[in-house]
Amino acid sequence: MDRKHAKNVLNDLLVVIFNQILSIEAEALRKQGVTLSMSEVHVLEAIMKTEEPNMGSVAKRLRITIGTLTTAINTLVKKGFVTRIKDPLDKRKVLLKLTPKATPVMHIHDQFHEDMISTVIKDLHIDQNEALIQSLESLSTYFREKF
């Protein structure tokens, strides 16, 4: 396969895989009764995975503006998935906290990713796993540095 054809195939694969993951996960969440959008689920995930989840740190993790995050957080607060609490150490700061209502959503989300990765690596040999990881790390580094 020549380089130009390989680039086209790789581009097509990345676009298709990205879209498939989002749509399949959205469907899996809907089947479990979750009415949140994938964007809202990813905001919940970012809050859960951020050490000190304030507006700035969560927006940075998601690579969105604080204004965009504010809109999402307002919706998630109204839906009962997130609360805002004053930082006990610095009253000027507002921390974001998931409510118990978010726990099953995060469990479904995590289980989807666990199943997806298990399926991807199930038939790969160790050297293929390592090659896949190395390729994806290179791709991730490119996106992180370029954008």
Q: What label would you give each PLM region?
A:
Residues 55-56, 67, 74, 94:
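Residues within helix-turn-helix
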Residues 1-34:
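N-terminal leader segment of winged-helix/HTH proteins
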Residues 75-131:
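Charged, amphipathic alpha-helical coiled-coil/dimerization segments
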